[in-house]
Design a protein with these regions (language model features):
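Short hinge/gating elements
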Residues: 9-15
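Low-complexity, highly charged intrinsically disordered N-terminal segments
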Residues: 20-21
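C-terminal subdomains that position terminal phosphate/3'-OH groups for nucleotidyl transfer/ligation
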Residues: 244-316
Length: 316
């Protein structure tokens, strides 16, 4: 993961995020979220939620899943995914289409593979890597927790009428892993198209890590100055009447300005990141607990951070 692109490709500056540093941040956020959820659930007795004596497993699985969530991401990031799919459509798909089917069964398989082979995706590739290519010998719980999206690459993207359309918006696994995924779902009593509960934590930790990361890296590279970042954010907050974020930005900006010039940039983003992460972890933990029944069933069709569109956190 170290040399894989987060935003800036082939970066030699160790301060700029790669997929490795990003993954370490996500794992840390996931651990924080899991602990916060457990602290709240303990107030009502963990027996009620079936988590008694499982605190460490809950936390460690959340952290582990988040640490390897991007393992399938190719060099050069999402741009590479598009390039790979384009290459496959031009070079491989015609060969598959020209293959003569001797039976209806082979023709049906060919039809499935035509969709599957041109839907390369980092999420689906992660499942392939941990189960086939590198054989990490993970438990069923660990494997299924990495399955962020529940649609096979060979299946059509659902429309808005599907009650699980968010969980199926991107490919989550390839046809080559279909039997294993179904076996795990059957063993763990997870319905088709549904998600493992801890995966919601991993997704929220990933979303939270993006809050300031790209802006921070842009300033580090000299693309933007600290003052430009401040002016852009405050201008947007004013336009959107966003008081929550504006208050945080102003407070941290003034605090950073009190430090000596060389440290203003680092201090601003450190203060800002800590404040935002603390607030957003509390928010997603509350959403997780309030919707724990749907999350336990795996039918909660939202990202935790985006669920309540009326909240100040969603607007921020």
């Amino acid at each position: 993961l170290q040399k894989r692109t987060q935003v800036f490709a082939l970066e030699l500056n160790a301060s700029i995020r790669s997929r490795l540093t990003h993954s370490l941040e996500v794992a840390q956020n996931a651990r924080y979220i899991a602990r916060t959820i457990l602290d709240e659930l303990k107030k009502n007795d963990l027996k009620t939620y079936g988590l008694e004596d499982m605190e460490n497993a809950f936390i460690s699985t959340s952290e582990m899943t988040s640490l390897i969530h991007d393992i399938g991401n190719p060099p050069f990031g999402h741009f590479a995914e598009e390039t790979i799919n384009k290459w496959l459509k031009i070079n491989i798909l015609p060969k598959l289409e020209s293959f003569k089917s001797s039976t209806k069964e082979i023709e049906d398989l060919k039809s499935i593979l035509k969709s599957d082979i041109c839907n390369y995706d980092g999420n689906a590739q992660a499942i392939r890597i941990i189960t086939k290519l590198q054989r990490l010998n993970l438990s069923y719980f660990q494997i299924i927790a990495v399955l962020k999206y529940t649609r096979g690459a060979f299946e059509n993207k659902p429309d808005n009428s599907d009650s699980l359309n968010y969980l199926k918006k991107k490919p989550g696994f390839y046809y080559s892993e279909k039997d294993l995924v179904e076996k795990i779902q059957t063993t763990l009593n997870i319905k088709a198209g549904h998600r493992f509960p801890i995966t919601y934590i991993m997704e929220a930790a990933d979303d939270i890590s993006y809050l300031t990361a790209d802006l921070e890296d842009s300033v580090e590279k000299g693309i933007l100055s600290l003052d430009e970042v401040y002016n852009i954010i405050t201008s947007e907050c004013t336009k959107q009447n966003e008081e929550f974020l504006l208050e945080i930005i102003n407070k941290q900006y003034e605090k950073a300005k009190k430090n000596d010039e060389p440290y203003q940039f680092n201090m601003f983003f450190t203060f800002l990141r800590v404040t935002l992460v603390t607030n957003f972890v509390k928010h997603v933990s509350d959403v997780f607990i309030k919707n724990h029944k749907a999350i336990f069933e795996g039918s909660f069709n939202h990202a935790l951070l985006e669920y309540d569109k009326t909240s100040k956190y969603y607007k921020a």
